């Protein structure tokens, strides 16, 4: 058959993260990759932190180019929203650069229907039960820990480049 040789200058970060796997799967194993390190070059990079309920998760931090930071932050928070299971309280997922939050989403709380046993039209009783539930959720959020599943750590590496 015919052979094609393509030569590119590309950041090493792009090669390391999933490029080789994608090349093999796209070509069904026929393509090969040969590379050599050319030079160091300065770039405008920032550290993208992931906060879950206000706590930094160092294992999920990324170093990204400043131009792509907002996009990667949004992508990371949306992916975590899919992977973190629902809790009894709202879970805030934020992407931050330094102290500045650039993307935010939240996993909604599971809710029990506290009004199921209230029949009739006593609105004040219903409101009291809902307020009591709301206060309990607030207390839970202060002491609650969120377990980050193992798939979340692998998903960070598989974000679309």
Curated annotation (Swiss-Prot):
* Cystine pairs: none
User: What is the enzyme's main class?
Assistant: hydrolase
Against Pfam families, the record matches this protein to:
EFG_C, LepA_C
Highest taxon in the source lineage: Bacteria
The EC number on file is: 3.6.5.n1
Q: Some GO term, biological process aspect, for this entry: which one?
A: positive regulation of translation
Catalytic reaction(s) noted: GTP + H2O = GDP + phosphate + H(+)
Q: Where in the cell is it found?
A: Cell membrane
Q: How is it placed in the membrane, per its record? A: Peripheral membrane protein
Chief place where the protein resides: membrane
**Molecular functions per Gene Ontology:** GTP binding; GTPase activity; ribosome binding
UniProt keyword list: Cell membrane, GTP-binding, Hydrolase, Membrane, Nucleotide-binding, Protein biosynthesis
Q: What Gene3D superfamilies does the annotation carry?
A: 3.30.70.240, Elongation factor 4, C-terminal domain (3.30.70.2570)
Q: Name one GO cellular component term.
A: plasma membrane
Functional summary from the UniProt entry: Required for accurate and efficient protein synthesis under certain stress conditions. May act as a fidelity factor of the translation reaction, by catalyzing a one-codon backward translocation of tRNAs on improperly translocated ribosomes. Back-translocation proceeds from a post-translocation (POST) complex to a pre-translocation (PRE) complex, thus giving elongation factor G a second chance to translocate the tRNAs correctly. Binds to ribosomes in a GTP-dependent manner.
Q: Which family does it belong to?
A: Belongs to the GTP-binding elongation factor family. LepA subfamily.
The name this protein goes by in its record: Elongation factor 4
